């Protein structure tokens, strides 16, 4: 009681992951404002698939604002195998977080979606209006539908209670504290780990697939700044895509070259074309973001890759891999 009118207590779920750690760093480096109290929690603090534990956490923290990053995630092959688990765990977690936020009277919730939720058959570039236009890719339908339901639930909280519960849709995020597991991580951290191993063993680097698919990569520290902007300034319930522009899309081959350059690797680079390429592209439009923030400057891709490679090398023992 007696808190000044502008004060905010922000609870960040999934606080130990890639994006959570980036928000923590950006806040510590000066993005936090006076009157803001940031609380970062991870699965060690509460099992968010458990309603009672989630409610107890929210009762204890009493957040005015929530950034919901926690999710059960995995690479392509784990998704294919465990679609039911990805659906159930994420649906339980999301419902528990959103409803606990509602029950403690949180003024705003910003959840994190993913571009994989978009319809498999679509036109490009993808934009925020297309989320529910058709089924997602069959490989990870459990995860994708669970994430889509956050948007459905946000709209229902707004319609029934006027809540400002919204969501952001980042493209391919990378940066320090990523999961650098080669089998189960995403493409860029997997490449960084592979180059590190090839360099230390003096062997060739093998990139899976043709190297032709194209992706929009966003640096986790840029995404963290945008998350904080959304939390403070973005008041729509409709989601917003957080991404570099369409012109900044890079091929997997170009991404591999950036990692090779950043890590000063001089060995042979080969492409294993027996491995699947996945979707050729998932180009997303950031024109909605640009109408709000025309001057936001993203970290240049090569610089962000360099910083991430340096972090991985310096923290090799502790890094998730």
Curated annotation (Swiss-Prot):
Reaction catalysed by this enzyme: GDP-beta-L-fucose + NADP(+) = GDP-4-dehydro-alpha-D-rhamnose + NADPH + H(+)
InterPro entries per UniProt: Epimerase_deHydtase (IPR001509), GDP_fucose/colitose_synth (IPR028614), NAD(P)-bd_dom_sf (IPR036291)
Swiss-Prot/TrEMBL site (Important for catalytic activity) positions: 114, 116
Pathway info: Nucleotide-sugar biosynthesis; GDP-L-fucose biosynthesis via de novo pathway; GDP-L-fucose from GDP-alpha-D-mannose: step 2/2
GO MF entries: electron transfer activity; GDP-4-dehydro-D-rhamnose reductase activity; GDP-L-fucose synthase activity; GDP-mannose 3,5-epimerase activity; identical protein binding
Disulfide bonds: none
Quaternary context: Homodimer.
Name assigned to this protein: GDP-L-fucose synthase
Source organism of this protein record: Homo sapiens
Name of the gene encoding the protein in the UniProt record: GFUS
């Amino acid at each position: 009681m007696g808190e000044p009118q502008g004060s905010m207590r922000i609870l960040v779920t999934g606080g130990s992951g890639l994006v959570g750690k980036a928000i923590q760093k950006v806040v510590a480096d000066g993005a936090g404002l006076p009157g803001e109290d940031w609380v970062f929690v991870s699965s060690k603090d509460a099992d968010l698939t458990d309603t009672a534990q989630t409610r107890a956490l929210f009762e204890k923290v009493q957040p005015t604002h929530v950034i919901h990053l926690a999710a059960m995630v995995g690479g392509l092959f784990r998704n294919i195998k465990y679609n039911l688990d990805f659906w159930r765990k994420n649906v339980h977690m999301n419902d528990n977080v959103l409803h606990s936020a509602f029950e403690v009277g949180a003024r705003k919730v910003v959840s994190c979606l993913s571009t994989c939720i978009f319809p498999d058959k679509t036109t490009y570039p993808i934009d925020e209006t297309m989320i529910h236009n058709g089924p997602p890719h069959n490989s990870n339908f459990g995860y994708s539908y669970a994430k889509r339901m956050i948007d459905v639930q946000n709209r229902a909280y707004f319609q029934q209670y006027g809540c400002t519960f919204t969501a952001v849709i980042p493209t391919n995020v990378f940066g320090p504290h990523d999961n650098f597991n080669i089998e189960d991580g995403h493409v860029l951290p997997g490449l960084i780990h592979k180059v590190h191993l090839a360099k230390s063993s003096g062997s060739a680097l093998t990139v899976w697939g043709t190297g032709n698919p194209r992706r929009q990569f966003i640096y986790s520290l840029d995404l963290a700044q945008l998350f904080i902007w959304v939390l403070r300034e973005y008041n729509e319930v409709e989601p917003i895509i957080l991404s570099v522009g369409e012109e900044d899309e890079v091929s997997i081959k170009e991404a591999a070259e950036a990692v090779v350059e950043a890590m000063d690797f001089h060995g042979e680079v080969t492409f294993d074309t027996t491995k699947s390429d996945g979707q050729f592209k998932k180009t997303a439009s950031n024109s909605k973001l640009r109408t709000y923030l025309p001057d936001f400057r993203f970290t240049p891709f090569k610089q962000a890759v360099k910083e991430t490679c340096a972090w991985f090398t310096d923290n090799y023992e502790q890094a998730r891999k």
